[in-house]
């Protein structure tokens, strides 16, 4: 018996090293620039194994009795890569380079549907500007960023050199700006203060063109632009930055500090900028509307604190302070902004969630002469808002219902004796996201808004469908929009510098818009050859009918009021246009993009010296982004934008193009050096009209940012 056992164990011992032999496979996962991708998932279909790449992009695994194996690598924002690797090669020889997928980069979007949805699955066209793209533009605020990235969008000046937006034929009061889904209080010349929208702690910007009032209510007539805050995933992060620009000796400095302990997540950001007045023309120029760009300084402070008491519940508190001075020749204008809010997000169970929030925003303006407040230009707008949003998932479908209540308070020097006015608005809305087939998605929504001051209500709806018919994705939608009359438009009584009186009209009706949109999209990859990479091409056409537009008309006077201008509703404008966008990036770091917008307006157009839409506009970029070695990364790009001459009977600026060169270098651990030459061709308008590019010619800037936490990795 003992001899038999010995023989059995001997045979097992001889077989063990044979059957137990396994081949070790090693590799490295890199992005298109050569930077390692941490957390990429490597799947081995034959064995069912899955491993993830480490901090340097490295991975290893064992498979018995094989010297070659097929793997599939997946990583958020990149095209899945299936390839064969060998065990007799080292990690460097088994390097796998991932290609960005333009349809999924920063793929989760919320603005178009108010629920998380991948970009490729959103039935409403959404443009996403990622954190990397924001960093490459070196933009200080949303105005700088959008000017470079979006064709058909232009910033100019209105009276008193206040910033004025025109986007696809719509003014600033018809485009809704949000920060994490919350509105901003205050306006000047019908535009929010874009300096409040700094980008120091912004993770991405989502842009939805066309009416979106069925989800967002008033002002979402021409589109929605939503700035979404970063949420740090590292235990701690500290970044410091400073930039100098020669025009106006401009300095911009800031910092961002984040902590993440799992349950607690905090993000604090501070940005301060100062600039001197920039002379555009000499004292003998009598034709230009703008002779100088006023200097000043700006401070932005923001805090966002998140707490997860359980895996299913998240509580968020936020606060912010804004201060800006604009230095004029004989006075200074001061601007203050205060914001705060609380939000709770509860995943009740896997099939339903609830979100409740409160938001407060305040915007004040005042005028100072010799450092003393004159009190003749005092302004304060305060908004309190309550939100509720409930989503129920029904298999692949989703039902969303929500309600909002907002109290709007305004006191301004444009009212009689600086009196105050207020109104309360309330709304309810419902949306159904229907996915009957793998290639078909339909979304329908309806909303009713009520406004107490004008005793008006507005019902809006949206219907959108997406068809995935390979290789094309087709999107089509109808959406209604409205803009309620503001407190200023209803109750204004203002002497405009002795030129004329302007009167409000309490009987104004809400503006209405009807938007129709069709878009075709094609995405894909070139897998082999010199130009291996990914591409995205989309073409869209749209039609907007904008009715009951609120504007001013001549007022003959009355027994108690002198003649002047009064706010009124009038027949609107028809806007037809098309957008074309193409993006391409190779596996070796070369990228190119081109965007074009065509715009045609008809009907009762406002031929204003401040708002003059241009029929043709385009933006383009050619860049190279490469991790050349472990301690050096290079980004170089040349970009530009073009605007045709506006169709106007008034004196206006002509067609122009502006070019920009950007060089960014990442050295060692967390040291980034930026150098920019703006207006590369040194373009200067002969006459600076209100809508001319306010450029002094070619300028340059240099900046440094330090990611302190990377020093210790």
Regions found by a protein language model. Give the residues of each.
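Short, acidic, small-residue-rich periplasmic hinge/interaction motif at the N-terminus
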Residues: 30-32, 40-45, 74-79, 88-135, ...
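Gram-negative outer-membrane beta-barrel transporters
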Residues: 435-442, 536, 542-546, 566-646
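Membrane-embedded beta-barrel scaffold of Gram-negative outer-membrane proteins
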Residues: 264, 355-367, 407, 468-469, ...
